[in-house]
Structures are given as C-alpha cells and as structure tokens.
A protein has these predicted regions:
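Active-site-proximal, substrate-binding regions of enzyme catalytic domains
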Residues: 7-133, 141-142
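Acidic, PIN/NYN-like endoribonuclease modules and their adjacent C-terminal/linker elements
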Residues: 130-132, 141-183
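Extreme N-terminal starter segment of soluble prokaryotic enzymes
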Residues: 1-3
C-alpha cells in the first residue's frame, strides 16, 4: 500500500495521538511503516513541516529527518492533462471571477500552486496511480477560505485517487485499534 501523507496529518499525529502513546508503540509502528515505504513523505511536505508549530513534527518524529526516505518531487513534471485539470477542475472559477484575477495573475497563481506540497501530492499520486495510492489529509472538502485552488480531498476525487483522514487510515486500512495502543 502506498500512503502519501500531508503536513496536516503529520501534525495531527504529533498533537493528538503521540501524547497518549505512553509506551511508544504507536510511534514505533508509524516509524516502521515510514521506513518500509508504506507511509510516504514527499520532500515538499518535509520542508513545509519545518515551519509548522516551530518544527514540532520533526522534533517528535525525528526519524522522518532521513531525507533518503523522502520522495524527491523535482522530477515530477505536470502533463498537459494535469494542466487541464488544474485550470478546469482543481480551480475554483467562482473565486477567480469574484477576485477579478487576470489571465497573467492566474498563470502566476498556477505557478505558485505547482510549487506547493498539495500540488505535488496530486502529481505524485497520479504518477503511481496504478499502485492505488491513498492520500492522507485532515483537510475537508468544505470551505476553502476563498482560495483559488480547491482542497486536496476534492482534487483527489477529480483524479480518482482515494483520500482519507488519519483516523480512517488507521482503522480501515492499517486495521489498528487505537485504544489498544495507548495503554
């Protein structure tokens, strides 16, 4: 199973799961799944994690500092089809109209978006789609704070890639009973 995790899920793991993991079992399980490639962290997600809550993710999950285990996204080149998706499905056209964004400004926004962890999660998911990847995020489909590009769950739906939250991943895919890990 290829599970690609975003920064919000890493932060949720650190904030809401680790404090109850008195025995270290849960952290050890997460580390094992990361080291054997079941949990994938993109280089862009790692870089973003450095700046979230004073680097708490990297402090608590020190094993993810091994850059050899990260997926390098520099070779991910968006295809013509991806650009079409970006312009037509991933984009919130109502917001573009509402903000009066010009074509030049929209091109700049696309360029900025393509450099984000979110866009790279989608690109990488498409590149390994034959392996049925799962994207893990704590984002929801609703309310996007007037951002031009839709959130990860909505975009995953557009490209037919499974997307779930951390609790769903643990329960349904990893078959983990969290209550047994916190003792």
């Amino acid at each position: 199973m290829n599970t690609i995790i975003d920064t919000s899920s890493l932060l949720a793991f650190v904030r809401y799961y680790l404090p109850f993991d008195k025995s270290g079992t849960f952290k050890g399980l997460f580390q094992t799944k990361f080291e054997n490639g079941e949990i994938i962290i993109l280089d862009k997600v790692f870089e973003e994690s450095k700046f979230i809550s004073q680097g708490v993710i990297l402090k608590e999950l020190e094993f993810i500092n091994d850059k050899k285990k990260h997926i390098n996204t520099s070779s991910l080149i968006p295809s013509k089809k991806f650009f079409n998706l970006l312009e037509n499905q991933f984009c919130n056209k109502d917001i573009v109209r509402l903000k009066g964004i010009t074509e030049v400004e929209f091109e700049q926004e696309k360029t900025r978006y393509l450099a984000t962890p979110d866009a790279n999660l989608l690109l990488y998911s498409l590149s390994i789609k034959a392996n049925s990847p799962i994207v893990v995020t704590e984002e929801t489909k609703t309310a996007n704070d007037n951002k031009i590009f839709k959130k990860i769950p909505e975009n995953c739906k557009e490209i037919d890639v499974e997307c779930c939250t951390l609790p769903k991943l643990l329960k349904d895919h990893f078959k983990i009973d969290i209550s047994k890990l916190t003792m």
